[in-house]
Curated annotation (Swiss-Prot):
Organism: Campylobacter jejuni subsp. jejuni serotype O:23/36 (strain 81-176)
Reaction(s) catalysed (UniProt annotation): Na(+)(in) + 2 H(+)(out) = Na(+)(out) + 2 H(+)(in)
Bilayer topology term: Multi-pass membrane protein
Localization per record: Cell inner membrane
Family assignment from sequence similarity: Belongs to the NhaA Na(+)/H(+) (TC 2.A.33) antiporter family.
A Gene Ontology BP annotation from the UniProt entry: regulation of pH
One term under GO cellular component: plasma membrane
Keywords linked to the UniProt accession: Antiport, Cell inner membrane, Cell membrane, Ion transport, Membrane, Sodium, Sodium transport, Transmembrane, Transmembrane helix, Transport
GO molecular function, one term: sodium:proton antiporter activity
Function in brief: Na(+)/H(+) antiporter that extrudes sodium in exchange for external protons.
Entry's transmembrane regions: 12-32, 62-82, 97-117, 128-148, 157-177, 184-204, 220-240, 260-280, 282-302, 305-325, 331-351, 365-385
Protein name: Na(+)/H(+) antiporter NhaA 1
Top-level taxon: Bacteria
Length: 389
């Protein structure tokens, strides 16, 4: 019996299994949204959930709690893993930071340029220039893990690091170009929460409840500030101490405790909530419109080209080095996966066009097709063409 339990636990925490679960939830969402349960699916996502304390009230649809709340925990876990790398891993050398930064920069500039070139002259369509700049880290990482053990773990760290810079870029883009109103008061409260965690860290305090309270205050204030709330998860991770005063692992313990919830609850729920695109509303004839072509070229061509080009230049001119144990073929394979914009691109699309159906949902279809092509081609390339030699 114990052997069976051990095998089940190993399966659940296996990252490849997590990737399969994400794909299953994605297909399930598409089936439900386009089947007889579509009305219940939408009601579930639009269900208002919240609380109030005095005059303060936070009452949002369940979809927001998933996208801004639960997924913040995912980015918190990413932040924890990155902190380990910065302090005790490859990123202890500042030179190793250059590569993911340059890769993310190329992955933002080139897709945006392609979209603008295709849609130049159409002011309204150009509002969506940032759609192909996004990467759905959860899906990209899941597919990378499904490629097997012949892919070096350093490439996983590279993708995660790239994702952080990519997400910061996305947050800045949203804050500057897609935010109508920023709250200074909320920013001040966020600053106080960050300062409190800094003090806790300096004093070496390792009471989880203290960090939890500060992180909740930070998350709410960032949410209210008008900036995407997932940034709170990354910021919180950077203030978690590596170990207790007695030398016991503190950060590692928190990270390990999150693995089950990430694999079995958070990421599958995120996929199920965001993948439900109503295919019946899509006008196939509009798939060759400027917005659709711009999105497809930006994600499937621009992302991999931009990320790889800027990475190659950084390596060629010796500003950076290849991730340990990897080669250019494997690096290019990871670059392909960055074209999986999926949920993040759908999110920015909703901000850019204010959830309008002016394009008959052809923009949504373009995101799905480009993400699907990037995922399939990236998996095939990494699995069968990219080798260590």
């Amino acid at each position: 019996m114990n052997n069976i339990v051990h095998k089940l636990k190993t399966l659940v925490l296996n990252e490849a299994f997590g990737g399969v679960l994400l794909i299953v939830c994605t297909l399930l969402a598409l089936l439900v949204q386009n089947g007889s349960f579509s009305e219940h699916y939408r009601e579930f996502l639009n269900l208002k959930v919240g609380f109030s304390v005095g005059e303060f009230e936070l009452n949002k649809p369940f979809l927001l709690w998933i996208n801004d709340g639960l997924i913040s925990i995912f980015f918190f876990a990413i932040g924890l893993e990155l902190k380990k790398e910065f302090l005790h891993g490859d990123f202890k050398n500042p030179k190793n930071i250059v590569l993911p930064f340059m890769a993310a920069l190329g992955g933002i500039l080139i897709p945006a340029m392609l979209f603008v070139l295709v849609n130049i002259g159409d002011a309204y369509t150009l509002k969506g220039w940032a759609i192909p700049t996004a990467t759905d880290t959860a899906f990209a990482l899941a597919i990378l893990m499904m490629c097997g053990k012949h892919i070096p773990s350093s490439l996983k760290i590279f993708l995660l690091s790239l994702a952080i810079f990519d997400d910061v870029g996305a947050i800045l883009i949203i804050a500057i170009f897609y935010t109508t109103k920023l709250s200074i008061v909320a920013f001040v409260v966020a600053g106080i929460a960050i300062l409190a965690m800094l003090v806790l860290n300096i004093l070496g305090i390792t009471r989880k409840s203290f960090y939890f309270i500060c992180s909740v205050i930070l998350w709410i204030s960032v949410l209210k500030s008008g900036v995407h709330a997932t940034l709170a998860g990354i910021i919180t991770a950077f203030f978690i101490p590596m170990q207790t005063k007695n030398g016991e692992a503190f950060l590692e313990e928190i990270y390990e405790s999150l693995k089950f919830w990430l694999a079995f609850v958070i990421l599958p729920l995120f996929a199920f909530a965001n993948a439900g695109v109503n295919l019946s509303n899509i006008d196939i004839g509009a798939i060759f419109s400027g917005v659709s072509v711009g999105i497809f070229l930006g994600l499937f061509v621009g992302k991999q080209a931009g990320v790889f080009l800027f990475s190659y230049l950084a390596i060629r001119f010796k500003f950076a080095a290849l991730p340990q144990g990897s080669n250019l073929k494997q690096l290019y394979g990871v670059c392909i996966l960055t074209g999986i914009g999926f949920t993040m691109s759908l999110f920015i699309d909703g901000l850019a066009y204010e959830v309008s159906d002016i394009f008959n949902y052809a923009d949504n279809l373009a995101i799905l097709i480009a993400s699907f092509c990037s995922g399939i081609w990236g998996f095939i390339y990494l699995k069968f063409f990219a080798t260590r030699s």
